Structures are given as C-alpha cells and as structure tokens.
C-alpha cells in the first residue's frame, strides 16, 4: 500500500537544492519514498512544508530535565552527581516518556548513551524494556551500554578527590559514588548479551546496540583496548565522550602527553565505527586525525552552553574535513528537546561573523539530519540517502505547519528555507513520519499514551522519594559536594589527579 503527502513547499535536500512548490511525496509499502513529483496545483487544506526528519547523535534518554533535579547552572564536574537524585523506577516508563519528547520535536534517529541505569531489574531486562519503548514510540535509537571502571568522583582515583570534600559527608559519598570495577571481558560480554536479547525480541530494527565507554578518563586502558578489539571483531559501533570541558583537556594533556586522540588511534579505537561526543576542546591537529580516520563528532551546542563547557570549534571541524552531527545531550536550550531550535542555535553560533561564511546551509543540514543516523545505526547500517527526500530514501519526514511559520506573508519571492531557519520550532510540527509510518500528529505521539505514561512516571517517582528516608539527606550531600568541588578544580584543572 502506498500513501501520499501533498505540500506547499518541499525541502528535499536543504542547502543543496532549492525549495520546490506544490509537490507530492509518495511513500511505498517498504517505508521508502517511491516518488516525488509536482502536483500541478496548490494542495487543498492548510499549507504544509515537508523536509527530512532530524537526528540527535548524542543523548542519554534522561527521564527528568536538569532544573527538575536542581542541576541547572552547574558545570559538568558537579552537575553529574545531581543525575542520581531521582530514584530508579520502571525503565519502560522512563524510556518511553523521554523518547516521546524527542520524537514530538522532530527526531527520528536518537542516540542513547545509557549512563543512567534504573536498576530495578536485571540489566538485560532493563535494556529489553528500553528497546520495547523505542518500538512502541516509533523512534530508532542507538543503545550504547555505558562502560567504565575507574574514577567515580572526578578525573582521578577517588582517594585523591575525596580529601577535598568536607569530612562529614565522605563516608556517604564513598559508599554511593565509588566505582566497583567490572573486568573488561565481562563488560564486553554484557554488550553481546544485550544485543542477542534485543534481536531475539525482534526489536533490532528499533535499537542498535553499541559499546559505550563513558570517556578516556573514566575507562582504563585495558577496558578501552578490549572495546577496540570487540568493535573490530563484531563491527559494532562505539560511542564515547571526549574533551567536553576545560578540565578534561587539562587531564588529557597531563595523562596523555603524546596526545589523547593519538592514543585512541594507537589502540585501534579511532575508526569509522566511532562517534565522539563534544570535542569542545579538541585542537586542529586532533580534528585532522579524527577526520582522517573517519570518526564522527557529535556537537552538543546547548548542552555545552548550559554546562559551561565552552563552544565547540565546529567551523574548524568542518575545515579539517570532520563528519559532524547534531546532539542535544538532554540539554536543549529551553529543556524541551526542540531539535529545530537546536539546529538554529548551532547555525547562529557557527556559521561565521559578518560576511564570513564558515558553515553552509548544506553543511548545516548534514549536521542536523544526514550524519546523525550513522551515529545511531552504525556506519555499516546507515542509509546513504538518509536526510533527503528523494526516491529510494527512507521516508523519515517532518511535516510542518507552513501557515504558522509564514504567518505574516508579504513577499512571494522569499526563500522558504530562510524562513524555516529563522522561525521554525517544535510547535510548528504537524506530523512526524518514520519509515513511512505516521508516529506523531498534531503534537501527539500515536504509538503510546504519553500523558498517561508521564503521570504514572511522576506518581511512582514521587512515591519512591517519599518512601526513602535518606533521599533528602543525599540531596543535601550532593549540594555540599558541588560546593566543595569548585575550589578543587579551580586550584588544579585536573583535580590534582594523574
């Protein structure tokens, strides 16, 4: 069975080809675009604009937003500990509500670096629930299993960081935050076990399992080497953070004087299978090596601003030939996962000043739509036509309310793409189509009852907090620890850790 969508404007390949008026997109039963052709007349009903769906190449599938947890305004190094303040609850509820929020805002491909485990069921069962949520919501996810074996409190051994924390909270901080190392082979085996379970459930088309080393400073060299070998053997993608903050840059220079990117290359991790989140403080020669090896960089503009990490050198990444993709990292500017607004913010910050053009619209669209699916699905599985509205491409589409965007129309000659870049936001999304299937219509996710899921999630979370007599004390401890860490990092950029 085929379906068709008529639109007033089609942006088939934004930046590479012009806007086309009065077009019909026909979608085949295989979930791919069968044809794109003029309608010959204006479509009846409300005017619509069709464009490729967006991708989020770095995120964590977080349940609650930063300010809900009291984490707003903190740098990453203290912000991290606030993420554990919400109690673990049903992982399906957590994932389905988070994924629904992303999908409503135009994201068809979503990277989930799963660093916040709910822990109310065995890990494999939790992962299966997350994959089931992706299927029910209708989004495609990359599911990177978080892997680490050191440094639970900072960028060095816990006993090095702990003396900077006030004495009365050290025991509780140690009990809750100290890393309990798991052997590299055991961590790698868990990834394989999860992949097997998700495939057996029939959800592999919605969840691509990946290795997710959290970062070099949180993973020992033996663990990173084991991941590199496993990725080479299986072809499985790898997703990790790199050089997100100034303190991570200082740590890297102290601990890898030969270069942290060269270190990744030397151990076989820097390959086309790798996505590196952030690289805010990467240097030109490091970016050149990343480009040469074919890895992808996921740039998270709002998150880097919100966590006071810096502004990524996106223009330099492009100049060096890096493949770059847009990430939201659970930290979009208004805490709403609005991918269209995130794209506009990145465009505003990175395109250049005055008459200088350091990023083209075509490159922007590669960043926002074409390159992200590769990070989510893996280099071997990504469709070369992703992020385009052309025959044969996956039918992953946004249908926007053109009446709402073009609400004060005066001049017929204006480029609709420029109006999109100036104004479009999540509120203008009339429909989201993934794989030829309508999954969002008029702001409502069709596969699940999102309001009911959110209500159930909040009820369970509030009940768990009320039943935990230590919850308030732990929140106070986290706030105290955040105060104590500031002087530590200001005194020594890498917390005195080697």
Kindly label every feature range from the protein language model.
Residues 1-41, 49-50, 496:
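N-terminal metal-binding scaffold of metallo-dependent hydrolase/deaminase domains
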Residues 52-64, 237-244:
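Histidine-centered catalytic micro-motifs
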Residues 68-140, 187-204, 458, 466:
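Alpha-helical scaffold segments that flank or form the walls of functional sites
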Residues 125-277:
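Metal-coordinating catalytic core of metallo-dependent amide/deamination hydrolases
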Residues 266-273, 315-404:
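His/Asp/Glu-enriched, well-ordered alpha-helical/loop segment
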Residues 394-454:
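C-terminal cap of metal-dependent C-N hydrolases
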């Amino acid at each position: 069975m085929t379906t068709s969508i008529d639109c007033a404007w089609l942006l088939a390949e934004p930046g590479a080809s012009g806007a086309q008026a009065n077009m019909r997109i026909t979608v085949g039963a295989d979930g791919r675009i069968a044809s794109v052709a003029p309608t010959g007349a204006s479509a009846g009903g409300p005017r619509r604009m069709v464009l490729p769906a967006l991708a989020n190449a770095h995120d964590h599938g977080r349940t609650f937003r930063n300010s809900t947890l009291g984490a707003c305004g903190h740098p990453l190094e203290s912000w991290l500990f606030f993420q554990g303040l919400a109690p673990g609850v049903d992982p399906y509820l957590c994932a389905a509500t988070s994924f629904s929020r992303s999908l409503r805002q135009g994201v068809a491909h979503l990277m989930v670096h799963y660093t916040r485990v709910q822990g109310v069921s065995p890990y494999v069962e939790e992962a299966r629930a997350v994959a089931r949520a992706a299927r029910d919501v209708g989004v495609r996810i990359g599911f990177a299993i978080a892997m680490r074996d050191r440094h639970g409190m900072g960028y060095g051994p816990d006993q090095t960081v702990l003396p900077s924390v006030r004495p009365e909270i050290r025991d509780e901080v140690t009990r809750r935050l100290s890393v309990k190392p798991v052997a590299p082979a055991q961590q790698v085996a868990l990834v394989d076990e999860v992949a097997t379970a998700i495939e057996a459930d029939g959800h592999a088309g919605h969840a691509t399992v990946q290795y997710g080393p959290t970062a070099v400073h949180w993973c020992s060299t033996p663990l990173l080497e084991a991941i590199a070998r496993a990725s080479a053997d299986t072809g499985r993608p790898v997703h990790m953070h790199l050089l997100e903050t100034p303190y991570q840059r200082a740590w890297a220079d102290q601990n890898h004087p030969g270069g942290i990117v060269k270190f990744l290359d030397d151990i076989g991790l820097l390959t086309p299978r790798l996505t590196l989140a952030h690289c805010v403080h990467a240097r030109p020669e490091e970016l050149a090596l990343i480009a040469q090896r074919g890895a992808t960089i996921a740039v998270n503009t709002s998150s880097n601003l919100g966590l006071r990490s810096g502004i990524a050198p996106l223009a330099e990444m492009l100049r060096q030939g890096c493949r770059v993709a847009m990430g939201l990292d659970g930290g979009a500017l208004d805490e709403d996962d609005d991918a269209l607004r995130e794209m506009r913010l990145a465009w505003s910050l990175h395109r250049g000043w005055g008459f200088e053009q350091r990023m083209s619209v075509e490159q922007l669209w590669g960043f926002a739509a074409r390159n992200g699916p590769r990070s989510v699905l893996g280099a071997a599985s990504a469709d070369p036509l992703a992020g385009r509205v052309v025959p044969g491409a996956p039918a992953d589409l946004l249908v926007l309310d053109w009446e709402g965007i073009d609400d004060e129309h005066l001049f017929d000659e204006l480029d609709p793409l420029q109006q999109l870049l100036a104004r479009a936001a999540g509120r203008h999304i009339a429909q989201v189509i993934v794989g030829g299937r309508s999954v969002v219509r008029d702001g409502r996710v069709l596969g699940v009852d999102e309001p009911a899921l959110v209500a159930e999630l909040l009820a369970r979370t509030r009940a768990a907090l009320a039943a935990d007599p230590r919850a308030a004390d732990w929140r106070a401890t986290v706030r105290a620890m955040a105060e104590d860490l500031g002087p530590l990092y200001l005194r020594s950029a890498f917390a005195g850790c080697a």
